[in-house]
Curated annotation (Swiss-Prot):
InterPro entries cross-referenced by the UniProt entry: Ribosomal_uL29, Ribosomal_uL29_CS, Ribosomal_uL29_sf
Domain of life: Bacteria
Keyword Plastid: no
A GO MF label: structural constituent of ribosome
Organism: Campylobacter concisus (strain 13826)
Biological processes, Gene Ontology terms: translation
Similarity section: Belongs to the universal ribosomal protein uL29 family.
UniProt KW keywords: Ribonucleoprotein, Ribosomal protein
Pfam families given in the database record: Ribosomal_L29
Protein name: Large ribosomal subunit protein uL29
Length: 64
């Protein structure tokens, strides 16, 4: 998901999306530990998405 798509969402939607991505990150880390994850690069992609969501939440709260 691109940052421009995140800017248009409300804080409640962003928080729900953030929670979903954190659960996904947890699941991916568990799969990595049990050697079930075929593509470890997914973890960094999800971490990047979480950072983008946090940035969008901060920008929305500050009124930017």
């Amino acid at each position: 998901m691109k940052y421009t798509e995140l800017k248009d969402k409300s804080v409640a939607e962003l928080n729900a999306l953030l929670k979903e991505k954190k659960v996904l990150l947890f699941t991916l880390r568990q799969k990595l530990k049990t050697m079930q994850l075929s593509n470890p690069n997914e973890i960094s992609a999800v971490r990047k998405e979480i950072a983008q969501i946090n940035t969008a939440i901060s920008a929305t709260r500050q009124g930017a």
